Amino acid sequence: MRAAAEQFARKPYSLVNLDDVVAAVDISRGAMYFHFPSKQALATAVIDEAHKLGHEAVAGVLANKLSGLETLIDLSYLVAVLDTGEDLARAGLYLLESIGRVEGLEARSLGEVIDALAQIARRAVDEGDIAEGRDPEDIARLLVSTYIGIRHTGDLDNPQQFLMHIEKAWTLLMPGFANPERMRYLSQFVRRRTAMASGKVLPQRGPA
């Protein structure tokens, strides 16, 4: 699975050859095809493993029991750290885009993420960090869309720059929905999270 994730993280789906995966793990083609009869079957398995990785990591953030908006901020940095440093996480997101439209997998997955973030945003409204009258689902959809956009326009192989894009996004977005009285603290919190995440990511990587 690790070899497959590396291939899917570094190449477009259409350019990944199962022979490359077989060569990387030194197994026979027969053994590979016994477990994964097609490239799509292997890709689907990678998506499933990436989902498990993400679920475990998110559970760790939720266990910190921070405020709702702090949790949303932490989750964005968590995803960025995984995306820039873990081939499995990166491959899972790439594959959701490339094959996830088949049978609506991408739409369902993103819908589940938006629903989960909306629940956290709703808590942030109750706690006073998000201003009254802001729709939690709208905020959740905005955050997901923003991350996807940064992912498309940024460079995942330049983690420090990518994290700065996340920080700038929060700086621009928060005035639109955060309680003005909390902006100073929240801005400081975002900067601290950038610094913490910067210590977790690998140096810039060149092309494979």
Model segments located where?
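Helix-turn-helix
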Residues: 3, 7-41, 45
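Hydrophobic alpha-helical connector segments
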Residues: 45, 56-89, 136, 140
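Secondary-structure edge/capping motif, primarily at the C-terminal ends of alpha-helices
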Residues: 61, 90, 150, 154-157
